[in-house]
Amino acid sequence: MASKKTGHPWAFRARFRANAFGWKSQPAITRVREAVAEIKKVAKSDPIVAADGAVLFLERVSPALAHVDSSSGAIGSAVNRAIEELVAVIAAAPADVKTREAWLERLYEARAADEIPYIELLGDLWGELCVTKEIASRWADREIGITRHALSPDPQMRGHYHGTMACLASLYRAERYAELVELLEPEKFWHYKRWAVKALAAMGKKAEALRLAESSRGPWTHEGDVARLCEEVLLSSGLVDEAFTRYAADANRAGTYLATFRAVAKKYPTKAPEEVLERLVASTPGDDGKWFAAAKDAGLLDAAIALAKKTPTDPRTLARAARDHVAKEPDFAIEAGLVALDWIAQGYGYEITSADVWAAYAPAKEAADRLGTGVEFRARVRSIIASYTRGEAFVGHVLRGQLGDA
């Protein structure tokens, strides 16, 4: 079916009907990704048509997903990623003011009708959607009256208003910073207060911005977001060392320890890998071993082994590291295998079986044989087994007949 606005036959349109998806999230996630890909492909040749398609998708996505199970957060994350990509498409389109205002009206209505809500993020990105300061200022004027009531410290007046975030984002894009700070002066909710922090920083009052952000910490505050905003303020001031020391770890926390290390190392290219690792390890007391993969990936093999020995480390991760380094770093392979056996002997690891014992032992033994230290290696394995009652019962049983000196 063709879009009524542009005549383009969007494939996603038929798929994103009201209540189109059942409770399973994966089919919906796949369709969301396909729709974004379809729109971005068109954007290469016709950015106006693509932007109109992006608006159409954002109008239809929430009603289509009404029955999808969102408890895991997967579908919400997929939609948020789609919103970020499509906002960029809309913002980049060389549209005239009338066309852009029409898009904004459509998105505003979609956001107002968003019951789940799936497209709530649009409010945060309203400044980007406005593109120009003039359009943003008109939206700020339109929304600021109700927003003042919604943000009132008087509980009799205060309430939720779907246009609040659009108002704050519009004020910021319009560079009406002082007005934004004044509006949010009594505000406690961080999701709103962060705009005052951004405004103060934009006004050059960066020390004041940092103080406001730090004073906003609390049980209902997103600590990672506070750290990211503070880090951004310091980096924009050229205070790299202070940003690194105070905020790098919390601001760049990712889904895995390895991903976190890579994010920090990428953002701070002047910092040596050893320094990045030290800062991150210090930020997670008691979790030293979980940084093993990050240290290994950075080529800090001695540090990786030291971390793995300090606190429990996944034996399978250690065994894979031993396997992968037999030829190029046999000393490391030996140590990784031995540490894996040690943690298994102590009872660590999820549903460990005899296969996991062999996975740790075999590459380490091969590496030792390559170096001519097989006798010493077997002695160290026997020492591990003898140190723990459970280890003697399990690891020793699995490796029975393998540890003679002959």
What are these regions (language model features)?
Residues 1-406:
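Eukaryote-biased, non-catalytic alpha-solenoid scaffold regions
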